[in-house]
Amino acid sequence: MKTQRLGLVVWMVTGRLALAQAPAPVDRDLLAKIRSEAMDRSDVAPVFDMLTVTIGPRLTASPAHKRAAEWVRDRLASYGLENSHLEPWHFGRGWTLEKLTVEMIEPRYLPLIGYADGWSASTSGEIVATPVFIGGKSPQDIAALSTQLKGAIAMTDPIMTNFVRKDRPQPSEPEYVPLSAAYATGIGQPRPNTPAPAQRMAQALREAGAGVILKPSRGEHGTVFVTGRDLGPGAVPSITLSAEQYNMIAQMLQHNIPVKMRVNVQTRFYDSDGGNAYNVIAELPGTDPGVRDETVMIGGHLDSWHTGVG
């Protein structure tokens, strides 16, 4: 008898749970409309092309970023979203690269793979000179070399030795490390904020009057990873080279092989918007009176680094 009662109780509980968890009816007509919009009338490709191909890199607070923000604002309004507008927030000076030349011209000609660091200053015109390799030297050593460094092309980092931790596995392989895990282990991470020794090095080069700084990329597997920051008036212009080419030039200098380079960096800073960057905000009001006052936020990055299109 007890067994029968227990069975009845279990049946009643599981039966109620099954009824409580019954799925809501599926509106297949609505799903078909959503699929049709995505597959037959998608606007993703034109939007993608406008932002990445036509406008291109969108460094925060740059004119290109402002242009992209205005275009997105108008595009969202054309879709019927309400209150589409730009919302300013203070960032600092905007910046764009206007010209970059970085070449080895002796002992043979070679166009080099390099990018001006974000917010780099401009060089005083074109610099044609033998680079000075100071990788591993202290700020005190640099001060002693001030005569050699005045107006010079300064290679500031030691020769790079870490290019690949292991052969890069493909996503289909069991040992593939997803991007999120790679960042957790430090692989390919952006450089942290400039540490004190690097700040002292930059100050020593500024005081020595160096013409331009060359440093190797920290990217692995042949990538060139470039960031940057606004170091204020009087900062020495700076360029990140591919690590392989940086090493090649440094090794030739160490073996007393004459090397000559041609470098020219021309950039422009912008304060026209008072140091503001912009978020793009638009609203899609709900229709259900029970929840229409609630807010669901959907967002994404509009900006990118100056060396990529995002």
Model-assigned labels for residue ranges:
Residues 2-20:
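Sec-dependent N-terminal signal peptides of Gram-negative exported proteins
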Residues 25-62, 225-229, 303:
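N-terminal capping segment at the start of a domain
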Residues 28-31, 44-48, 52, 56, ...:
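Extracytoplasmic/secreted envelope proteins and their assembly/folding machinery
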Residues 29-30, 114, 119-144, 228-309:
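Soluble metallo-hydrolase cores and metallopeptidase-like ectodomains found primarily
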